[in-house]
């Protein structure tokens, strides 16, 4: 059975519009409760590479995060946290002043930092058979990935698959770049990581994306779309097509 990827055309960061589109996207995927059981402990994982002005398209836009948080709360999901293994700074420091902190306060969602890494064995892995994952991640029942559409110096693009690298604890992220130095080996490791953590849903903010010297120093470019899927490879394949890349080259 082929994976389903939902494309949601959207040209601006207006909360009501994004909220409505995300609800439509969830309906196309079978409904929120078919993806995430009621009562589940949920971790929201945006792209929080570093502290930057929202307009620079470095991080997942706060309105996208806020609209999805609103949907979860309105549907009765009680146990929600937000976290990322940020490239620079703490989670709270990166989101402070972006507007994301305001949304989290409104919907009573704590922004947490990872405190401890736990060796996690994944024997099914092809490239990587173990990861050091945060204790706080392993305490959750399910993960929702909220990625940002960007270029990437090593992997050409950073999207749904690459967003999961923020699950690797602390300095082990830097170690991974040494351990898997080529684009191919790093990409295969990322696939193993996604299968190991197994986020239940992937949402991509591509309303304003990043081109050029990504993932942190590129230029904002309007792509006017959000994407949703339960399959990160399928989602990134569509992303690749949108920017005229062959998916097999990524």
What label would you give each PLM region?
Residues 1-250:
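N-terminal and secondary-structure boundary signal
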